[in-house]
């Protein structure tokens, strides 16, 4: 017989164990925010953090996102608030609500909100995510290697697809709440309805180049699902028996090593982990397996590895799981091969359901270049990047094609049979972002993050012929890891009677002084004057620019110096073979959205009726490759359109990005 005090003590300890997950996961404030509201019921919303408030707060995305993140944080860090804001907040007084029923409504709402954090399956999903995070950090490694694991985007994509689908099918009543939690955990912002529908799909296909860890990544997914999700049934199908056997043994080994406290059995190609009331199982089979079949099974997750090489008879059996509402089928395979019978999944590219994800080193616009140009091994738009552990060069290409014609494009690069003859280097997305998304560089909130050095590149031209070259001038600064265009000029001499050196220098100085007037935070102006045409004129231009700036502004002015024939440093820059590297660097950053224009951009020589950014875009669109005897160079000249301005912008960004501070000196 137990005493009353003992019963109470045991009950409290039992409840503490049962709801431990709730205390770990839920950080919802239970303090009632008592404030009066004076609007109609249809305009009222109720949240744990704000209490009763006006529904327009749902449209204030930063506020709503902040509340959701705070809701799921396990260890809240103290927030830093500006003293002025804190003082103003303390001055605000809220009238208490006159209706006492509001507090009881809030309490009931909060209690219903906590249901998610008490749900056993939610705690299982949260445990899966915690274990995966520990594995990524290297905490499950017993051999002293604590290096973090860096996942590729396609691996993160697979992980998100798996856990989202399980959450939606296992907890349909709380699906939206679970999804809000998972978007926070995976740090996915701006998730729209279309993205969620894609994640909820029953079937997804991932085509990835070889040697990228497709099968390697499947092992921890199966292991942690078996350990955390009670009653889950997983199926794994490989194209060959030895592959499925290897994966099974890897899963068994990892489970026994990482979860020694669990009861793990491996019998008849099925791994089982015993939980308190139910078992979690994973079945491993191959399309040639006569002893273990997936027929008649019921899976929550079915993974089909190297799907392109699965026997057609076995494939029809796999497709039989499509009508099963609670089954997620993941097809994972090498990207492509030259044989149409082993590349049939590429047909899903035209599917309206967005079920196909393809990883490739080359985009569709430039796939043809790998065949046309002998040493080409990368996408010329430089939008797609290969991992550091993958080494691809001309020797790899030649060797692969010697063994098997077309093997490089199909087996290594992940390309598909492509008839596209487009050779566009600049993407539409990059053009649109450059044209419409511009920073206000006089905004006080942005200024602390802007670079304090202004780089000016000047490419002088000594002609008044507007059909020929003009003088291109570009002023560039930095914002974190991005580049901002502060000013641009495309100057043509009015006549050959004009003193060209003086006119060009005054044009550049006028632009620089205007930029400094608007942006007084600059501490140094670094000027690069191209001297390929006339070195003597370049030196004279440098002297005139310095005289003009120092007469009007108290700021340090330095020039890029190059040794002349007598090894004496002169204030000019000789453009050489680095032009190719500079253009490639520009294309990569432009297509990645790292180059922006200032809203307060300065330009005196481009017509008032013409937007300078649109003017620059016309030249940017003209950038194209020129291949002569397997040597690749770039040009933006087309018909009557010159490339002076864009070359100045490209070189200014290239010099700005490099470690060339030692080359800048005063004169």
Curated annotation (Swiss-Prot):
How does the record describe its quaternary structure?
A: Interacts with the terminase subunits TRM1 and TRM2. Interacts with portal protein.
- The enzyme class is hydrolase
Organism, as annotated: Human herpesvirus 6A (strain Uganda-1102)
Amino-acid biosynthesis in keyword set: no
Where in or outside the cell is it found?
Host nucleus
The catalytic site is made up of: 306 (for atpase activity), 459 (for nuclease activity), 530 (for nuclease activity), 644 (for nuclease activity)
Q: For this protein, what is any one GO molecular function term?
A: hydrolase activity
What gene name does this entry carry? TRM3
Q: Which GO terms describe its biological process?
A: chromosome organization
Protein's name in the database = Tripartite terminase subunit 3
Show where the record puts the motif Walker B motif. Answer: 301-306
Top-level lineage group: Viruses
- Residue numbers covered by motif Walker A motif: 208-215
- EC number(s) stated in the UniProt entry for this protein: 3.1.-.-
Secretion signal: which residues?
none
One GO cellular-component annotation of the UniProt record comes to: host cell nucleus
**Which keywords has UniProt assigned to this entry?**
DNA-binding, Host nucleus, Hydrolase, Viral genome packaging, Viral release from host cell
Explain the purpose of this protein.
Component of the molecular motor that translocates viral genomic DNA in empty capsid during DNA packaging. Forms a tripartite terminase complex together with TRM1 and TRM2 in the host cytoplasm. Once the complex reaches the host nucleus, it interacts with the capsid portal vertex. This portal forms a ring in which genomic DNA is translocated into the capsid. TRM3 carries an RNase H-like nuclease activity that plays an important role for the cleavage of concatemeric viral DNA into unit length genomes.
Q: What is the lineage of its organism?
A: Viruses, Duplodnaviria, Heunggongvirae, Peploviricota, Herviviricetes
Protein family according to the UniProt entry: Belongs to the herpesviridae TRM3 protein family.
């Amino acid at each position: 017989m137990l005493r009353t005090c003992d019963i109470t003590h045991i009950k409290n300890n039992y409840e503490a164990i049962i709801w431990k997950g709730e205390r770990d996961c839920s950080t919802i404030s239970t303090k009632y925010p008592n404030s009066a509201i004076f609007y109609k019921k249809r305009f009222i919303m109720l949240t744990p953090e704000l209490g009763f408030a006006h529904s327009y707060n749902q449209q204030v995305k930063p506020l709503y996102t902040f509340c959701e993140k705070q809701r799921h944080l396990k260890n809240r860090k103290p927030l830093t608030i500006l003293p002025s804001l804190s003082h103003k907040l303390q001055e605000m007084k809220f009238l208490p609500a006159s209706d006492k029923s509001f507090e009881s409504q809030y309490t009931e709402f909060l209690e219903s909100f906590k249901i998610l954090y008490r749900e056993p399956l939610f705690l299982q999903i949260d445990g899966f995510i915690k274990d995966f995070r520990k594995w990524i950090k290297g905490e499950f490694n017993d051999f002293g290697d604590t290096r973090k694991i860096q996942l590729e985007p396609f691996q993160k994509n697979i992980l998100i697809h798996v856990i989202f689908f399980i959450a939606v099918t296992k907890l349909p009543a709380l699906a939206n709440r679970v999804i809000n939690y998972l978007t926070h955990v995976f740090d996915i912002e701006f998730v729209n309805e279309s993205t969620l529908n894609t994640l909820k799909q029953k079937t997804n296909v991932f085509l990835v180049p070889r040697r990228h860890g497709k099968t390697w990544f499947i092992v921890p997914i199966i292991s942690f699902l078996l350990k955390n999700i009670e009653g889950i049934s997983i199926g794994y199908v490989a194209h060959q028996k030895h592959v499925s056997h290897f994966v099974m043994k890897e899963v068994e080994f990892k489970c026994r090593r990482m979860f020694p406290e669990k009861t793990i059995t491996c019998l008849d190609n099925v791994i089982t982990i015993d939980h308190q009331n139910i078992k979690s199982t994973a079945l491993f089979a191959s399309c040639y397996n006569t002893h273990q079949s997936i027929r008649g099974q019921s899976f929550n997750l079915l993974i089909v590895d190297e799907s392109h090489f699965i026997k057609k008879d076995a494939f029809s059996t796999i497709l039989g799981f499509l009508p099963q509402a609670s089954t997620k089928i993941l097809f994972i395979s090498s990207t492509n091969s030259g044989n149409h019978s082993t590349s049939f999944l590429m047909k899903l590219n035209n599917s309206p359901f967005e079920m196909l994800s393809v990883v490739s080193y080359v985009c569709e616009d430039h796939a043809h270049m790998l065949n046309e140009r002998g040493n080409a091994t990368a996408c010329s738009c430089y939008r797609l990047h290969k991992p550091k552990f993958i080494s691809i060069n001309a020797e790899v290409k030649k060797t692969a094609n010697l063994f098997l014609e077309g093997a490089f494009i199909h087996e290594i690069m992940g390309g598909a049979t492509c008839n596209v003859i487009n050779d566009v280097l600049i993407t539409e997305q990059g053009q649109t972002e450059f044209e419409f998304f511009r920073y206000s560089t006089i905004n006080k909130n942005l200024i602390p993050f802007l670079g304090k050095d202004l780089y000016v590149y000047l490419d002088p031209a000594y002609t008044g012929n507007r059909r020929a070259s003009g003088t291109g001038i570009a002023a560039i600064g930095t914002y974190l890891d991005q580049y901002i265009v502060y000013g641009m000029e495309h100057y043509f001499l009015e006549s050959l009677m004009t003193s060209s050196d003086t006119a060009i220098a005054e044009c550049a100085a006028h632009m620089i002084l205007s930029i400094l007037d608007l942006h007084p935070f600059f501490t140094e102006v670094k000027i690069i004057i191209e001297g390929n045409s006339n070195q003597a004129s370049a030196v004279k231009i440098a002297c005139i620019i310095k005289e003009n700036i120092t007469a009007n502004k108290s700021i340090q002015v330095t020039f890029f110096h190059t040794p002349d024939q007598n090894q004496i440093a002169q204030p000019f820059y000789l453009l050489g073979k680095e032009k190719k590297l500079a253009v490639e660097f520009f294309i990569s950053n432009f297509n990645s959205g790292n180059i922006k224009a200032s809203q307060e951009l300065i330009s005196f020589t481009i017509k008032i009726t013409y937007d300078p950014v649109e003017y620059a875009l016309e030249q940017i669109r003209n950038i194209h490759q020129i291949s002569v005897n397997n040597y690749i160079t770039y040009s933006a000249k087309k018909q009557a359109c010159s490339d002076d301005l864009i070359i100045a912008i490209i070189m200014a960004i290239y010099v700005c990005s490099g470690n060339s501070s030692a080359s800048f000196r005063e004169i």
